[in-house]
Amino acid sequence: MKQIQLIKPGGLENISVCDADVPMPKSDEVLIKVAASSLNYHDLLVALGAIPTEDKRVPLSDAAGEIIEVGSDVTEWKVGDHVMSVCFPNWQSGPPKYELLSFIGDHEDGYATECIAIKASAITRTPSNFDLKESATLPCVGL
């Protein structure tokens, strides 16, 4: 599959399209075929190096797609479900705590990829009246 990697943070010239293996979801993960992604200011800051990240990071925090595989322990999702990313995947409820406010695309690989394996709790269902392209624009701005 193809994915975009930030070979080294510090400039847009360091973004490259690369080949990668399709990931295998762990027992608590789902495999999503990414249909659409959207860009936001966070993604630019990561690429420019203003938000620290590792070399070869797959950027982008906002996307929508279809589940194509579910891990053995996942019960809340099924193949074919339309889902989108969430802005803070580790913050499930309650007052925000600093350690829970990491973004996909800076502390872990993001959605600039054809397929992503991600924790089942790190996604949400797309609105029924939005297509996948429209849904991909919601995670950050919809918060």
Model segments located where?
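Short beta-strand or tight-loop elements
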Residues: 13-18, 63
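Short N-terminal binding/cap micro-motifs at the start of the first secondary-structure element
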Residues: 10-15, 41-43
